[in-house]
Amino acid sequence: MKMRSLLSLSIAGLLSAPVYATTVTGKVTDTAGQPIAGAEVKIEGSRRVAYTDANGIYRFDDVKQPHIHLHVYSSNYIHGDNDLGDVNTGQNVDFVLKPASVENIVVTANALQSSVLESVTPVTVIGAEKLHKIEAPTLGETLKNAPGVHSTYFGPVSSSPVIRGNDGPRVKIVQNGLDVSDVSRVGPDHNVATTLSSATQVEVLRGPATLQYGSGAIGGVVNVVDKRIPQYQLDGVEGEAETSYSTVNNGSYTRADVTGGSGNIVWHVDGFYRDTDNADIPGFASIDPDEDEPNGVLESSAMETRNVVAGLSYVAEEGYFGFAVEQLDNKYGVPGHSHAHGEEEHEGEDHDLEEHDHEEHAEEGVLLDVDMTRYQAAGEWHSPFEGITNLKFAAAYTDYEHAEIEDGEPGTVFTNESSDIRLSAYHEEVNGWHGVFGLQFNHSDYNAVGEEAFTPANTTSSYALYLI
């Protein structure tokens, strides 16, 4: 009877333990005392985020975390933070941010997610605003003017990034930190199967920072970041749309991006459609043109691309978990890409770019028909247990196929089925040091069938542990 009474008192004591809900507010200004509008304020170890208004004011209500560490980000200012420690009363915390000489963006490909100015390794980040201004049909053409980056130019619709003179498998392409899992590293005229229409930023890593993505990426890593899996709560609907037209190839481009939510459920949908004819050029494409080559047209440079992405997340203060699916259909030509066929001659043939109403003469060149389906999941759990501040999970499964079509028939077919899983744990501060450790698993089943199947079929599995 006595033990039962003690147990009842203990349970009652636990249930009646106070749960503090505090309010955190403050003002963000620059060194001249002027308010900074639109600055992003985050509570570390939480999915809570607030943005400053026109007067630089931010506010968090009903904060239940006992330990509060605030971070402030603004693209034109140096990152600010303030560790308040354990608090149980309302807090008023002001920030004064120093201006940055360059746009200051958080690098998500970096394990510790430091900003550009705080990063000790070479990194280039292109933000959403600039990205939409320079966006080209391919990743290689989009990044070709970034420092140390060039393009394996095979026409306006076929190229891949070259970093510090390295391409192919020496340059790794990832989408939201996971391998894009196409076959662009196999051939320089194979496009990267990642899209930029809804990307929030593109990050180019060089040097030791690339080791967290494997030992083979000695040239660099390109990380395309988008918001297909929502990570923060949103009440209502927001989005944007764009359409454009180019005269050089009668090209049309339309994209839309919509995100909405209610309570803990947040969804996202985006997509685009691009359709171009062969590009107009001055004169002939060849140095020594034959009599059948047309003047003023770059043959086999047309493109038709469709892409749709849909994602859904459950977002709470303790973390989030979401899932997304993507479907990419891309048909594009490779100018001047001809193959020997014994004594056969292919002259004066017309190639139809799959339901295009415009016929283009193409003595040389092939059409690449890409079909890719990608499933991706991601999640984050704040303060899961003692000693760990964050636990992150990301996984992707990709089913990729592309056929190189010549004379209306598939010549070589490349396929790749790939799975990529990454788990990261961030430990609490130890003597002023922050760190992360984790593991990654990748499985790839690659095959190529046809006259240009220059690499044998192979199945690869890799496991890795890392500590930073």
Segments and roles (model prediction):
Residues S301, Y320-L391, Y397-S418, G450-T459:
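Flexible loop and strand-edge segments within Gram-negative outer membrane beta-barrel domains
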Residues L131, L143, V202-E203, V222-V224, ...:
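Non-catalytic regulatory/gating segments with a bias toward low-complexity or hydrophobic composition
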Residues Y73-Y77, V87-H132, G140, G168:
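Short, acidic, small-residue-rich periplasmic hinge/interaction motif at the N-terminus
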Residues G239-E242, Y253, D257-L368:
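Periplasmic-side early beta-strands and strand-to-turn transitions of outer-membrane beta-barrels
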Residues D179-R206:
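Short acidic/polar hinge/loop motifs at secondary-structure boundaries
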Residues V123, G140-D182:
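Extracytoplasmic beta-strand/coil segments of soluble accessory domains associated
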Residues R47-I57:
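Short, acidic Ser/Thr/Gly-rich low-complexity loop/linker segments typical of extracellular
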Residues I43-G45, H71-D83, P282:
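A short, solvent-exposed loop/turn motif at the edges and junctions
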